[in-house]
């Protein structure tokens, strides 16, 4: 039912209030808002020219409808044009009906830049936000790259492309080596698995003792013993290659094969053999203990250091299996068995990689190679191109001199040695043209190798400092937080750690909001 308000007639208590569809003669048009619009009235829930009150992370401002109407595609522009309160609530995080204020749980610093955008139509990059956080905020408020000012657009695009590797050029940045809280949280989550496990408290202590050399005095002693065994195994392998041991074992092997017996029982020196058995027993103890104490079996087999431990003992057991398989097939098969055993013995060299568990530098080197595959690929490409070019030139200049440059593939060795500036001197050019080609090859190698090596070195420095910082953070966390867990009940669950993690994140968000710019006593109009 349509009701009209006539001049001189007061209907203050009449509900619902409605919009006057046709202005009276002699009166200016005025729009009134219905407090309780009916379902069929089609009346807007707020005036179209009403200022928009917003609260972004504690910063309160008022934006005029005229400023928002210039950018109807943005989030605030769509909020201003919302036809109903339900539609408006979908665009904000909360709405205060009493104050008619919209709340957004977003970065307050970016919001101040957003206000500047509504005034000028240009968005400027904020140095206080990383490029990805800035992009997320811009996407949330409905701004694209076209909204960026011309003075900031090129810089933003450049930072977005170089941000993942920004520490390559500025590796001395303190924040670049700070350990990520998620990395420490992953360790805590792994240890939380012991809460529901059998003998979880004891297993947790033993696991920290074996995995973290700085956890306690027993862990330091265990690390020293492990390093000593690895070094003893490597020393025994090197001593075994000395000529006197080779001659003695070769004579014993010939006698054993002639007698139709396996040469494996007499080839090794008794002292070296006992030392090898002791090292194998220790390595097997380490692998089995870590497997039994690991919080997650799947993660155990995915860890590179654990795979190195398995490879270090695998040749010994493969040799035993080969001896059992061929032990009853006569002396003729012992020759084939010897070749297999030699291959397995060669795999013992991987034991030196066990030192990576106790060396921050080796772990940093592995991380560097893992994250430098692009640079390594570029280096190999440069070397391949240079070797191919200079090998062809050297072959053309030296093929008539009979000094080792007979074919282009034969010149590849010379090109590789020259470009890497090693210079063995086994093959050298003798003609003037060949020497000029060699000079160009050496100079080109210096330039080509130096370019990627600098980037790889910066990455190694970054990962080394980051690894040291992470170890210190985890060690401090172990001594403080994990000791509290150990002294408490064993019913520590992953859910409790997730709750604590969310609490810490909320605390960080609160700190961020507390750092927001101070707001004026009353909302300002834009």
Swiss-Prot record:
Q: Which SMART domains match?
A: BTB
InterPro entries on file: BTB/POZ_dom, Ion_trans_dom, K_chnl_volt-dep_Kv, K_chnl_volt-dep_Kv5/Kv9, SKP1/BTB/POZ_sf, T1-type_BTB, VG_K_chnl, Volt_channel_dom_sf
Membrane disposition: Multi-pass membrane protein
Q: Which GO terms describe its cellular component?
A: nucleoplasm; perinuclear region of cytoplasm; plasma membrane; voltage-gated potassium channel complex
SUPFAM superfamilies given in the database record? POZ domain, Voltage-gated potassium channels
**Where is this chain primarily localised?**
membrane
Chain ranges on the Extracellular side, renumbered to this chain: 240-270, 323-337, 396-408, 429-435
Which terms does the record give in the GO molecular function aspect? delayed rectifier potassium channel activity; potassium channel regulator activity
- Composition bias, Basic and acidic residues: 499-511
Keyword Transmembrane in record: yes
Q: Which Pfam families match?
A: BTB_2, Ion_trans
Q: TM segments?
A: 218-239, 271-293, 305-322, 338-358, 374-395, 436-464
Intervals of motif Selectivity filter: 421-426
A biological process (GO) of this protein is: regulation of potassium ion transmembrane transport
User: Localized where?
Assistant: Cell membrane
Q: Indicate the family of this protein.
A: Belongs to the potassium channel family. S (TC 1.A.1.2) subfamily. Kv9.1/KCNS1 sub-subfamily.
Q: Outline what the protein does.
A: Potassium channel regulatory subunit that modulate the delayed rectifier voltage-gated potassium channel activity of KCNB1 and KCNB2 by altering their kinetics, expression levels, and shifting the half-inactivation potential to more polarized values. While it does not form functional channels on its own, it can form functional heterotetrameric channels with KCNB1 and KCNB2. Each regulatory subunit has unique regulatory properties that can lead to extensive inhibition, significant changes in kinetics, and/or substantial shifts in the voltage dependencies of the inactivation process.
Q: How does it assemble?
A: Heterotetramer with KCNB1. Heterotetramer with KCNB2. Does not form homomultimers.
- Name the record gives this protein: Delayed-rectifier potassium channel regulatory subunit KCNS1
